[in-house]
Amino acid sequence: PIGGQTLKKRLCDMDYVVKHRSDQCCVTINYPAALSGRYDIVESECRAMHTEFDAALHIIDIVPATLFSAKELIAVGQAIAAGGGYHLKVNPGYGLGSTFEELSLLKRVFGEQFILDPSGGIRELKDVAEYVRRGFTVIHSQKTFPFIEEFRILKERGGHLNV
């Protein structure tokens, strides 16, 4: 479910996911509300989704972090946490690309309160190594399979990721 959809539509999509036996669902926050400073809406919608589906799904709240200033991103994180969120996927798609700065800010402010997944714009194995060095354990990229192959070749040649 994407953030521009109504809450009702996102809940229906999540119900569909549960009925088809998935155990995980990524849901984009209502970023138009967040961009308007309506963090109360982000919080209430997150609460509705997590209350309804946390027992059946591992919910990953998607945050297009690059759209927000640092202050706004912190407010978004607070709203998601207050709404029951615990796992954030940062900047997937939309050509936004994750940045070390955004993820470091979220990690610094929220500590272990969230599982944080960088996503989007991760195009080089050295970027993966840097995220791993910074403590991130799940990294999303369209280049996952090429990274695996590149890492396999690196290991065969006796090399390793510099983390």
Language-model features, listed with the residues they occupy:
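Alpha-helix-loop-beta-strand connector modules within alpha/beta enzyme cores
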Residues: 1, 39-60, 64, 83, ...
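Glycine-rich phosphate-binding active-site loops on the catalytic face of alpha/beta enzymes
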Residues: 1-4, 20-34, 82-99, 120-124, ...
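Catalytic cores of alpha/beta
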Residues: 5-16, 68-79, 108, 112, ...
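Short secondary-structure transition/capping segments
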Residues: 7-9, 37-40, 72-73, 100-103, ...
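Conserved anion-binding
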Residues: 9, 14, 22-87, 163
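Conserved, mostly hydrophobic/aromatic
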Residues: 17, 61, 88, 106, ...
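Alpha-helical structural signal in soluble globular domains
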Residues: 20, 48-52, 75, 79-83, ...
